[in-house]
Amino acid sequence: MTQAQATSISTTSLQIHTAPDDRLVYVLVNDPLARPLFEELAYEYSSRYAGLIDTDEIAREMQRYPVEAFAPPHGAFVLLLRDGQAIAGGAFMRHADPGTTEFKRIWASRNHRRQGLARRILTELEVNAVRLGYTRVFLSTGPRQPEAIALYQTNGYTLLSAHDFGEDQPPGYLFEKHL
């Protein structure tokens, strides 16, 4: 996808805004450029799930997958940099189901929200998943993340299940999309 194509993607109420020096880079999850993503995600999860999820559990979740899970040839980790700083990012890895990839850690910095950056990352992940031969995306998000739920619903993802805390199922919203 070219810069011009990325900046022209829109929905009825959201235009993707990019600065002239924005650039997408592929790195490993342990690259220092990725640190702000994980720090801000941990803060976000701690804020949204205070009293529901222990902070130690959040820290474990941030380290749950080995570096190789989000690396070629079966995955990738992309950051959107502005002025050399990560302002958005996301990853994908091979899922247990053949032909399926799982998207993880799709994020936009809280100082750069409502600019369509998460949508840009989502699109970039989809394009690269297709290049690697994946035909289906699976992803999950938490019940206290309405922005993520809306992002997936407005980008053609089908809701498979939705459960909140206190139900007899693990909490989370599960989605899929056939590429």
Region locations from a protein language model:
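Conserved amphipathic alpha-helical interaction elements at protein-protein interfaces in regulatory
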Residues: 127-131, 158
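Acetyl-CoA-dependent GNAT
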Residues: 17-104, 109-110, 122-124, 128, ...
